[in-house]
Amino acid sequence: MHFEDEEEIGAVTNGTKGITYVSSDEYTAEVSDDGIVTAGVIGTADITVSDGHNTKTCKVTVTPRYNYFVDPYFGFGQTEAQVRAKVTTGTLVELDEALGYSYSSGSSLYLYIYEFEDGKLAAVGLLFKVISPYSTNYANYLLERYLLVGENEGMYGFLNKERTVFAGFNPSNTSDGVYITAFMPYEGSARSSLPNFIESINSVNPRFLRHLEKLNLK
């Protein structure tokens, strides 16, 4: 299954009790009282079906439609040397208090920038040109992988399923013709602190942009 796909579990019972459906992970696969499964973020989930006497389990696997990018490394708090050891793909460019990695897909490039504060990884930025193949269905790319938690002043906030990483993306902010998605470590309640996280995202985005000339994003 893919994000937002629906499938019905064809369960029947000879008993007098109704059938119940329970998902082991509702972020990946949500199931209705009628047995309709709706796919969420990528991953696997078990749907337990029971009529009170017999119980069966079926596995749901949600896979991505869009594989535009190599997954970023979220080793927040780690040193530059530790990040270098973990990120083994892309072309490395050493930056001022940051590491840049460029990747190509056809004639288009995208970048990951790993920003450090006091020698520790503090933020990760994904950058690509607005006019590029990556722009098509990019929102769905994010929704396949992250939970949308809200919007504030045009910035959309996302969390990973483990609730350890916050992401911010503003589709109307196209500074220098570039889209930026910033990732930062997450702690606390996303809804109550969304404006604070958006403020943090807005403060870190210019730091990503200052590296563009050296990284030569085309």
Cite the ranges covered by each PLM segment:
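Extracytoplasmic soluble-region selector
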Residues: 1-72, 78, 82, 86, ...
